[in-house]
């Protein structure tokens, strides 16, 4: 959540939020996808997408500039051939995009962060490692009611701003 908020606030510098939590449970009905959607405040719900297509037709680069949270729902549907593209997308901080009916490319900041869900535990099969994904087991039904978005995002923003103050303070000996 901290990385997501930093991404939205444009506080990522040369590196984007390149880590995605993946909610996993072998049992269906734990509300993993519902929880992912509930992370977005109602006013920003149109910036949530749970149908990421890793193809030219899906325009994933454009989605990074236009959406706030991309849910890789049923993460195991992405094959090993798509992982290099996904890893590349996850580390992009700026995007060169040519919007519809335009001839010139524009450099746009990346806004979107990633999250995912799966009903399988054997989904990370990359022999070179999977440092971009953190699997979190949903052991019980996730309570998605009464998410206090104002409080959550105010706290995340305060933590980010506080970290900036600590970074910019001169070292005292």
Residue ranges and their predicted role:
Residues 1-65:
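P-loop NTPase catalytic core of nucleic-acid-dependent motor ATPases
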Residues 59-65, 99-117:
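AAA+/SF3 P-loop NTPase mechanochemical coupling elements
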Residues 68-90, 124-129:
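Conserved AAA+/SF3 P-loop NTPase catalytic/coupling segment centered on the Walker-B
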Residues 83-106:
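Conserved catalytic/switch belt of AAA+ P-loop NTPases
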Residues 119-123:
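Short, polar loop motifs at secondary-structure junctions
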Residues 125-142:
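A short helix-turn-beta junction within AAA+ P-loop NTPase domains corresponding to the substrate/partner-engaging
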Residues 138-164:
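C-terminal, non-catalytic macromolecule-binding modules
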Residues 165-173:
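Residue-level detector of conserved catalytic or cofactor/ligand-binding positions
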């Amino acid at each position: 959540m901290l990385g997501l908020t930093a991404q939205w606030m444009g506080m990522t510098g040369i590196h984007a939020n390149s880590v995605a939590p993946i909610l996993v449970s072998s049992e269906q009905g734990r509300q993993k996808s519902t929880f992912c959607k509930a992370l977005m405040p109602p006013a920003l719900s149109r910036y949530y997408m749970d149908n990421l297509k890793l193809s030219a037709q899906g325009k994933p680069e454009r989605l990074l500039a236009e959406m706030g949270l991309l849910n890789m729902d049923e993460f195991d549907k992405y094959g090993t051939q798509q992982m290099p593209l996904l890893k590349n997308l996850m580390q992009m901080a700026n995007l060169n995009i040519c919007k519809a009916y335009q001839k010139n490319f524009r450099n746009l900041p990346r806004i979107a962060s990633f999250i995912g869900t799966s009903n399988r535990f054997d989904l990370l099969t990359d022999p070179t490692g999977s440092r971009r994904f953190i699997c979190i087991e949903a052991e019980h039904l996730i309570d998605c009611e009464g998410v206090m978005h104002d409080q959550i995002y105010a706290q995340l923003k305060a933590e980010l701003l506080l970290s900036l103050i600590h970074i910019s303070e001169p070292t005292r000996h």
